[in-house]
UniProtKB/Swiss-Prot annotation:
GO term, biological process aspect, one: DNA replication, removal of RNA primer
GO molecular function, one term: RNA binding
Swiss-Prot/TrEMBL keywords: Cytoplasm, Endonuclease, Hydrolase, Manganese, Metal-binding, Nuclease
Cofactor note text: Manganese or magnesium. Binds 1 divalent metal ion per monomer in the absence of substrate. May bind a second metal ion after substrate binding.
Domain RNase H type-2: 72-256
Entry protein name: Ribonuclease HII
Gene: rnhB
Cofactor(s) this protein cannot do without: Mn(2+); Mg(2+)
Reaction equations catalysed: Endonucleolytic cleavage to 5'-phosphomonoester
Entry-linked CDD domains: RNase_HII_bacteria_HII_like (cd07182)
UniProt main location, coarse: cytoplasm
Record-stated family: Belongs to the RNase HII family.
GO CC term (a single one): cytoplasm
Length: 256
């Protein structure tokens, strides 16, 4: 029978990652309800971790298939910022290798700000290569949002030091002479596209925080350019600023 206190057992269980750890057998024979409750929590943590690992490996299937087909340099492409009334579209291209093991990487919209910030730094450190590109509001107004997004995505691919032999693109096919796999909701299906979505999101959020200081009164650091009540109130009071998209309603109503 375990001689540790329930609190000590709970602390030990929090550090165990191997389901075959011999200490677990001892804890299972411990009749104390607190120990058994801690074991149940431990089992649930292991199950959740296994599910996360399985989902991670599933999101790696497109990359693995392409590597096995001989495409050593595969880039995942995603964008952030198609819907806001203000600010640029930001696109990112990320190249990973088979050693990449950040299980938490998934669609940036499913992550908390803290999770994104942590993963962003890890992706920059562990990816083979990362490149970013932007399409500013003026270009969006000139081309339309879809064409501007395509243009920025192509820029992010061309900015890579080594040109990829295959692209995995979130939803938007690109007019570029590189073989492509286009995935609807690609940031939920491909790990490299998910990594690109995280980097693009963090970079754009940082830009919008800078714009918030340059153009106060619209709440850009909080709404990221989306049409929130505070943003619309700022438009009503101040009119449109240089980063507003003049072709996105209701912005034209506030252009001086």
């Amino acid at each position: 029978m375990s001689k540790q206190s329930v609190a000590q057992v709970r602390a030990l269980l929090s550090s165990i990652t191997d389901p075959q750890d011999p200490r677990l057998a001892e804890f299972k024979d411990d009749p104390r309800k607190g120990v058994q409750a801690a074991l149940n929590q431990f089992a649930k943590r292991l199950e959740k971790r296994a599910e996360a690992r399985a989902a991670f490996l599933n999101r790696f299937r497109y990359e693995n298939q392409l590597w096995q087909a001989g495409h050593q340099y595969v880039a995942g492409i995603d964008e952030v910022g198609r819907g806001p009334l203000a600010g640029p579209v930001v696109t990112c291209a990320v190249v990973l290798d088979s050693q990449f093991d950040l299980v938490g990487v998934t669609d940036s919209k499913q992550l908390s700000r803290h999770e994104r910030e942590q993963l962003y730094l890890r992706i920059l450190d562990e990816a083979v290569e990362v490149s970013l590109a932007v399409s500013p509001a003026q270009e969006i107004d000139r081309l339309n949002i879809y064409a501007a997004t395509q243009t920025a995505m192509i820029r992010s691919v061309k900015a890579l030091h080594h040109q990829p032999s295959h692209l995995i693109v979130d939803a938007v096919p690109l007019d570029i002479p590189v073989p492509q796999t286009t995935l609807i909701k690609g940031d939920q299906k491909s790990i490299s596209v998910a990594a690109a979505s995280i980097v693009a999101k963090e970079y754009r959020d940082h830009l919008m925080a800078i714009y918030d200081r340059l153009y106060p009164g619209y709440g850009f650091k909080d709404n990221m350019g989306y049409g929130t009540a505070a943003h619309l109130a700022g438009l009503e009071q101040l009119g449109a600023c240089p980063i507003h998209r003049r072709t996105f309603r209701p912005v034209p109503d506030y252009v001086n």
